[in-house]
Regions:
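NTP/phosphate- and nucleic-acid-binding module
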Residues: 1-716
Length: 716
């Protein structure tokens, strides 16, 4: 989108080792960018870790190869790559296909495309990163894709593992990798986390840290890099109990959803409430939908505009075989829709594979309210005889017999064969088959009473790519402040008779420079790198006036800068606007005697008078967003009303189909959430438009926040 500019000079990330020509995909943050990132992570922790009571961890970035072999990363963590047959240059195959299709859909000659062909290309693009090597080769060949740099032919796509390999220790005999995600550290520490949480689920663990991926073709600034910060959450929950106690608080939030069925049909977004998405089976369960909604609220709170945010469901061939449902939060940027946050229901896969490989029970046990009698198969036999007969294979035989008993039916089938013929064939690990006899083993059906349930929890995982979200924030909060006087002067100069070409070119250059000088980042105050600038307007102002203001701001935790430059106050304001500093305090020669300063707000440029003693605390409250500028403006003497606020500077608000439930006082005096009722009609399955349906209701009996029930005629 043209309204999203590239980074300005203040926030451009620096290429790593820039004085040595840089390295693709590696970046350093400067002072302003680093401050925004730290503030972003602080808001993230407050929004998720604090509010949800999560257990935060910090795990090592060096990971033994055995861990990532078990998780599947060694074998499957790869992108498909093609090479230029002439130069050997490497390209990511799916992105090359996407770029080619984008050019066909929007470039020269695109208007001649038939509707059916346009639809086909859009569907191919939607599936590009889910194709097998053979399917991708077929599409690249069909579209006659060649190397974008040399025009030469490309090799067939082949997998390229994205992990950085290393060795741990001086002997070099322990292979390892730089972690490609932070999640595995939390999975292998699950047992300790469960103990810390007193053995109870649901609970969530989280981690903020660096991950590494050896990207084939890094590009687009922070969007595709080789080292990046992730903030990941692993929410552990009973596999059959994926309701969420706080779901009603977000059920009325309306989101832009892009379900898989729409991606393969009309390509339309669906506007619907989170509650209706669960009721209609669009999102698999309440817990997954809850985190999707919480992510939407978080992204909007840090400056992402709701109209530039959508949630796209993974196609069936994109998801891992163990995943139940996956939704990506995508932010609209200059390069298109960019995946920034993944939400996946990973089932119990990770804990299951690590449990099996480590021979450690990564399970949860909890007492049953009423003991249950369950059918069991009891095995008897002569283990000594089996040991002598099977020798080295006996361990595998015993494991296969135990598995048959656990399953029940296979063991009774073995007994039936023993009763009928005196022998039974047993398949063991490795594909071999052994013969059992009646004097070796027997099986008997029975029952036993169990008093506790043992289960492997499912995992709901929201995973945040911090750098990508920051780039989205930079693009969504940037605007050029209109300057009516400069525009009028430029128009008058252009209209002046006799203006020469040289004069016009000079004027155009000046206008471009003016645009840069009036660049503004409309960061929310909590995200701004510096909260307030203290402008000293007169060289006669003694330090004894300025220093106490700065000292009190520092004591209150408010970051500030002092600007006593000799440039005009307008230029000094512009410099701070470009840094996204939301507030400015002006101190003049009369401040000492009057006890007053003026406070300027960045986006409206309005100013009010404040008492010197009150200013630091008011600025602190504004920076923490516990009060608003509108309140301050209404309660204090106005110096000037400023200018109309630019549309891109107006803080966007999420849309609610119905407001979240308000707390109601119970008989015991504690707050209990009210029971909400969602009355918005669910959307049609594919068209994305609302159609009359039976209203969705909320039941709250016996639950903290209630849960949604399916209507009589749920969405197919």
């Amino acid at each position: 989108m043209s309204r999203f500019p590239p980074f300005t000079r203040q926030f451009s990330p620096l290429s790593l080792l820039q004085i040595y020509s840089g390295v693709a995909g590696l970046y350093d943050f400067g002072p302003a960018g680093c401050s925004v990132k730290e503030n972003f992570l602080a808001v993230w922790k407050r929004h998720f870790v604090l509010q949800e009571g999560m257990l935060q961890m910090e795990c090592t970035t060096l990971t033994p190869a055995s861990v990532l072999k078990v998780s599947g990363h060694v074998d499957k963590f790869a992108d498909l790559m093609v090479k230029d047959t002439k130069t050997g240059e490497c390209f990511r195959a799916d992105k090359l296909l996407e770029d080619t299709i984008d050019q066909l859909l929007t470039g020269e000659g695109s208007e001649t495309l038939l509707s059916a062909e346009r639809t086909r290309l859009m569907q191919v693009r939607a599936q590009a990163d889910a194709f097998t090597p053979a399917q991708l080769h077929e599409q690249l060949t069909q579209l006659k894709v060649v190397s974008p740099t040399s025009g030469a032919e490309l090799t067939e796509p082949f997998p390229f593992n994205l992990m950085f390999a290393t060795s741990i220790g001086p002997a070099g005999n322990m292979p390892g990798f730089l972690r490609p995600e932070t999640a595995q550290g939390m999975f292998v520490n699950f047992k300790r986390l469960l103990e810390y949480n007193n053995g109870r689920v649901p609970f969530a663990a989280c981690q903020i840290g660096t991950a590494y991926r050896n990207e084939i073709a890094p590009k687009n600034g922070l969007l595709r890099v080789r080292e990046f910060t992730m903030a990941e959450i692993e929410h552990f929950v009973h596999p059959q109990e994926k309701e969420h106690t706080a779901f009603a608080s977000v059920a009325g939030l309306e989101l832009q959803l892009f379900p898989a069925r729409n991606q393969l049909s009309d390509g339309k977004l669906v506007h619907m409430s989170v509650g209706d998405a669960v009721v209609g089976g669009v999102i698999a369960n309440e817990t997954l939908a809850y985190f999707v909604a919480r992510t939407a609220l978080f992204l909007v709170s840090v400056g992402i505009r709701p109209e530039g945010l959508r949630f796209r469901q993974h196609l069936a061939n994109e998801m891992a075989h163990y995943a139940c449902d996956c939704w990506d939060a995508e932010i609209l940027m200059a390069s298109g829709w960019v995946e920034c946050v993944g939400h996946a229901d990973r089932a119990a896969y990770d804990l299951a594979v690590h449990s099996a490989a480590s021979k450690t029970d990564l399970v949860v046990s909890r007492p049953l309210p009423t003991p249950l009698e369950v059918p069991v198969v009891v095995m008897g036999g002569n283990k000594g005889l089996m040991g002598k007969h099977f020798k080295g294979a006996n361990k595998a035989v015993q494991a296969a017999l135990a598995a048959a008993c656990d399953a029940g039916a296979p063991a009774m089938a073995l007994q039936a064969s023993l009763d009928a013929t005196g022998e039974a064939a047993l398949a063991i690990e490795g594909g071999a088959t052994v013969t059992l006899t009646k004097d070796m083993v027997s099986f008997e059906a029975g029952t036993k009473k169990i008093h506790e349930e043992v289960f492997q929890p499912s995992v709901i995982e929201p995973s945040f790519g911090v750098g990508r979200i920051l780039e989205g924030i930079f693009q969504h909060t940037f605007y050029i402040r209109p300057d009516p006087e400069a525009e009028a002067a430029a128009a008058a100069a252009a209209a002046a008779a006799g203006a020469g070409d040289k004069k016009k070119k000079k004027g155009a250059k000046k206008d471009a420079s003016t645009d840069i000088d009036r660049a503004v980042f409309a960061f929310p105050p909590v995200l701004a790198p510096t909260k307030v600038a203290v402008f000293v307007l007169d060289s006669r102002v003694p330090p004894t006036v300025v220093q106490p203001i700065v000292a009190e701001l520092t004591r209150l935790g408010v970051t500030s800068i002092v600007d006593n430059a000799t440039a005009s106050i307008g230029k000094r304001y512009s410099r701070c606007d470009e840094l996204g500093i939301p507030f400015g305090v002006t101190v003049d020669f009369q401040t000492e005697s009057s006890g007053q300063v003026t406070l300027r707000e960045r986006d409206s440029t309005a100013q009010v008078y404040l008492k010197l003693a009150q200013a630091p605390r008011i600025i602190r409250d504004l920076a923490e967003e516990t009060i608003t500028w509108a309140q301050v403006f209404a309660e204090h003497e106005v110096k000037n009303t400023g200018a109309p606020v630019h549309p891109l500077a107006i803080r966007p608000q999420p849309k609610w189909v119905q407001a979240p439930p308000a707390p109601a006082a119970s008989a015991a005096g504690t707050a209990e959430p009210a029971v909400p009722v969602a009355t918005a009609a669910p959307p049609s399955p594919a068209g994305g438009t609302a159609v009359p349906k039976e209203p969705v209701t909320v039941e709250g009996a016996g639950r903290t926040s209630g849960h949604f029930t399916r209507p009589a005629n749920p969405i197919a």
